[in-house]
Amino acid sequence: MKMLRNGYLLSSIALIALVLLLQVTPALADKNPNPGVLPPNSHPFGKTYEEWNAEWWQWFFSVPASKNPALATNGALDCSVGQSGHVWFLAGSFLTSGSFTRSCTVPVGKALFIPLINSWADNVCNTPPLTVDQLRASAASGVYPPSNLHASVDGQAFTDLRSYRSRSPVFSYTLPPSPDNVIDAAFGVSLPGPCWPSLTVTPAVADGFYIMLTPLSAGSHSINFGGSGPGITLDVTYNLTVGS
């Protein structure tokens, strides 16, 4: 955000973004135990955490496997791939437990939506198809019960992370053609295929624990997050350079 030296006033564009970001009632703001993280019942940029949950998965599936951060182990990334708007997404790891350290650059003024642990479910290859309630139960089984949920920025740990659980609305997602998509990369399944007739999948639902970080100041920052769910344990560190 740009501040004018002669009055320390936010620019009009930044002010609008700030108003959209802070759509939290004063009572909620007063009770927020985690300064720098928007409360789970807030509406960052006019959307609920649940809606951002769905958007995270749509972004994740849309990113080619060759550039997908959730398939990366360690090292430098291009965090701009598939990103747009006021909110950028960070990623954990797709179907793989472990500790990962990554680095990338994020523009000033971007809020960050981060999954501590998360899971999704859809009806691909399900015969007969599951109901939405059954899909929700399937997604929940990947993250609940959680343990060791953790998140911190520059060593400042956040608390009460179980309260940041988010269950998405029903959504659709679209994959790039094979071989450069996450399903082909993870399972060796060429798409479209016999039980996956379309690159666009619906219905899908997701469950997980997410935090929405308010924009970080320019400079270097370290973000650590992760946790354990049934069958997966993650500890992820992003060394970020926040710049123009």
Which stretches of residues belong to each language-model region?
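Sec/Tat signal peptide C-region and signal peptidase I cleavage site
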Residues: 24-29
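Bacterial N-terminal signal peptides
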Residues: 12-23
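N-terminal segment immediately downstream of the Sec signal-peptide cleavage site
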Residues: 30-86, 227, 232-244
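Ordered hydrophobic segments in well-structured contexts
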Residues: 53, 57-59, 86-91, 111-117, ...
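Bacterial N-terminal signal peptides that target proteins for export
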Residues: 2-13
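Extracellular-facing segments of soluble proteins and assemblies that are Gly/Ser/Thr-biased and enriched
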Residues: 86-185
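Extended, well-structured beta-strand/loop surface patches
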Residues: 147-220, 226-244
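Sequence contexts marking disulfide-bonded cysteines in secreted/extracellular proteins
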Residues: 78-80, 105, 124, 194-196
